[in-house]
Amino acid sequence: MFQNSMTPLGYYDEFNCFSDTTFIIAAGAAGEIGYSRTAFWAADDCYYFDCSEMLLSRYLYYIFKSEQQYITSRVRKASIPRLSRETMEKMMISIPPISEQEHIISILDRFDTLCNDLSAGLPAEIEARQKQYEYYRDKLLSFKGAD
């Protein structure tokens, strides 16, 4: 169950949001953007977005993440910070064809994994540096044309 933070408040055997849903925290940690691969319960301080066949939820997540600064700037600062539903409803976004959305998602998911998943990102980085090392080592030690 998500309510006023990106940390689940708890776990519940029922849900009101299906898996692969983009959501935004509306109070407390207002403006924080999340994406859930599993079904969950969204409390009243959590806006979630039902996407149509024209808009993929993961694409919407990345759009919102790219607009994080704008969304955060729209949070009303008070004793409990709050983001209005109207702010989100008025946001204009570009919706390319599904195939392009899938391509964008694929690229951004891979980049996200490399940056945030140490078990995937670190080995890939180590492998890239190893290849770079071998390339420069071989170049330095080849002595071609040194006659």
In which residue ranges do the predicted regions lie?
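Charged, alpha-helix-forming regions
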Residues: M1-D147
